[in-house]
C-alpha cells in the first residue's frame, strides 16, 4: 500500500508522500519548499518567501469565519539524514523508501522516516489547501535548517511574520 492510498486524513497523506519523495536533508530542502509553494499557489493561496528561503502561506478566512481568530501553523522542512551503516542511500538524491505494514509507516531500517517534521508540514499543507476546513485566517510558516541550529527560525524577521491577507 502507498501513502496516497490510505483512507484517513485525505490530503495529509498525499502531502506526506510528496515530502517523502522529495529529498530534504538540512541545507537541501529548498526544492521541497518550492514544491509546497507551487501546491499552495495552485490552491489560490498567497505565498511569500523570505531571503533565507522560509515560506509563509496565507489563507483567507473561510466564508462566514471572518470574525474568528487567526491561526499560525509552523513546521520545519528539513530532516535528520541518518541511515543504516553501509547503506548506499543518498539523502541529497533519493526519495525515502517508505513502507506501510499494518498500522506502521517506516523506512524498513534503511533510513529515518523524516516524520519530524514532515508530518507537521503535511498536516499544515492539508489544512491550508482543504476548502472544507472552516476557520479564520490561517498562516502556514515553513522554516529551513531547523535540525542544524534553528537557522531558518533565527533568520525570520518581524516584518515577515506581521500582516496577513
Say what each PLM segment does.
Residues 2-102:
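Acidic/His- and Gly-rich active-site-bordering loop/insert found
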Residues 146:
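Extended substrate-binding grooves/exosites of carbohydrate-active enzymes
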Residues 149-152:
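Glycine-rich phosphate- or other oxyanion-binding loops that anchor nucleotides, phosphorylated ligands
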Residues 65-137, 142, 157, 163:
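Active-site metal-coordination/substrate-binding segment of hydrolases
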Residues 4, 12, 22, 111-112, ...:
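Residue-identity detector for threonine
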Residues 44, 163-164:
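Short, well-ordered alpha-helix to beta-strand connector turns
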Amino acid at each position: 500500500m502507498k501513502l496516497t492510498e490510505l483512507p484517513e486524513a485525505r490530503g495529509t497523506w498525499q502531502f506526506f508522500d510528496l515530502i517523502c519523495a522529495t529529498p530534504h536533508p538540512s541545507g537541501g530542502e529548498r526544492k521541497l519548499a518550492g514544491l509546497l509553494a507551487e501546491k499552495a499557489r495552485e490552491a489560490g493561496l498567497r505565498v511569500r518567501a523570505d531571503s533565507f528561503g522560509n515560506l509563509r502561506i496565507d489563507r483567507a478566512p473561510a466564508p462566514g469565519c471572518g470574525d474568528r481568530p487567526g491561526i499560525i501553523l509552523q513546521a520545519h522542512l528539513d530532516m535528520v539524514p541518518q541511515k543504516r551503516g553501509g547503506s548506499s542511500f543518498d539523502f541529497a538524491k533519493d526519495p525515502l523508501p517508505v513502507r506501510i505494514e499494518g498500522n506502521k509507516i517506516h523506512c524498513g531500517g534503511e533510513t529515518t522516516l523524516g516524520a519530524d517534521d514532515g508530518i507537521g508540514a503535511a498536516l499544515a499543507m492539508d489544512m491550508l489547501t482543504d476548502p472544507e476546513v472552516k476557520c479564520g485566517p490561517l498562516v502556514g510558516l515553513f522554516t529551513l535548517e531547523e535540525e542544524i541550529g534553528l537557522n531558518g527560525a533565527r533568520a525570520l524577521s518581524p516584518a515577515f511574520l506581521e500582516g496577513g491577507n
